[in-house]
A protein has these predicted regions:
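Catalytic machinery of carbohydrate-active enzymes
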Residues: 1-313
């Protein structure tokens, strides 16, 4: 049982991958939020994905119980700390317990199974997604941008993304002449529109609302680099093995920075604590808390990331 949120669900894929490696003849059932069901579709050892569509009076848990109680489960992994894992027949179960430890979420998830090596997130791709990705993202250098987020407070201004794209793709830059692929969900077009409008039409690749999660991962796999807000898309890019730079403001990078050797992050001059403890902070507001992050440090962080890795040709 994993998250409703794309980012947390992506980060949990390492646990599933570990269990499937440890038990090579086993299959898995995954219960998750509707928005992340497609993430598990390409994994041929996941035989069922149950969408936990929230219902009144915890009806979604009752429905999941009726779908689960008739099976004896060898292992139950409950990352939502629900009562359900106690109410279905099982041999062993493992429950995630949230703590305030200053460690990455992947490390915390690994502790659920007592793992000394954190289970790196991964994505599963199938050939159909790879074929479609080749149609959507052309050969040659492509810079991927993720200008959206599930909350306005975490969004770096679209105008800053536009300036970043120009800086990184100008003559003599690290990605000189690259196309720019803009990713986001269908309902996020308004957030990305100023960026798309500012890019030359022969340079931009508009992928807003055109992909599910596996296809987005396949498209990202064809990009040289991803730069984006702290979001599920950022974690998807990192899990797909794409060099990934995450942008942080009102979220704690020690817990949610992109995971992997070819990743990095840059944050606002203000720390997470300074932002959320400010007198004018309101978590209900959609106002960006990322405006103090200038383009220059993001360019510098991108160049630093590129210098640490060898970008594919």
């Amino acid at each position: 049982m994993t998250s409703n949120r794309v980012g947390d669900a992506v980060l949990s894929t390492g646990l599933l991958d570990y269990l499937l490696e440890q038990y090579p003849t086993a299959t898995a059932t995954v219960a998750c939020g509707p928005s992340v069901v497609s993430l598990f579709r390409p994994c041929n050892r996941v035989d069922k994905v149950v969408a936990l569509q929230k219902m009144r009076y915890a009806g979604h848990w009752v429905r999941l119980w009726t779908q689960s109680v008739g099976t004896f489960w060898n292992i139950v992994v409950d990352l939502r700390a629900s009562a359900l894992s106690w109410a279905i027949p099982h041999a062993r179960h493992f429950i995630f317990k949230s703590t305030n430890e200053p460690v990455h979420r992947v490390v915390s998830l690994g502790k659920v199974l007592g793992l000394s090596e954190p289970p790196a997130p991964r994505v599963w791709l199938d050939e159909a997604d790879a074929v479609r990705a080749r149609q959507l993202v052309p050969d040659g250098p492509v810079l991927a941008l993720g200008p959206t987020a599930n909350w306005g407070g975490k969004q770096w201004p679209a105008s800053s993304f536009l300036e970043l794209a120009k800086r990184l793709t100008q003559p003599g830059a690290a990605l000189a002449g690259a196309r720019v692929a803009v990713f986001g969900a269908d309902g996020e077009r308004g957030m990305a529109e100023p960026l798309l409008a500012g890019l030359p039409t022969d340079q931009s690749i508009d992928l807003i609302g055109r992909t599910d999660l596996p296809l987005a991962a396949a498209c990202l796999d064809r990009c040289r680099l991803f730069v984006g807000n702290d979001s599920g898309l950022m974690h998807l890019a990192a899990a797909a093995g794409v060099p990934t730079l995450g942008l942080f403001g009102p979220s704690p990078e020690q817990h949610y920075r992109p995971w992997g050797a070819h990743t990095g992050f840059v944050r606002t001059p203000e720390s997470f604590e300074q932002i959320v403890n400010a007198k004018d902070y309101d978590y209900r507001s959609q106002q960006s808390r990322m405006t103090s992050l200038a383009v220059e440090p993001v360019v510098a962080a991108t160049e630093d990331l590129i210098s640490r890795i060898e970008l594919p040709a």
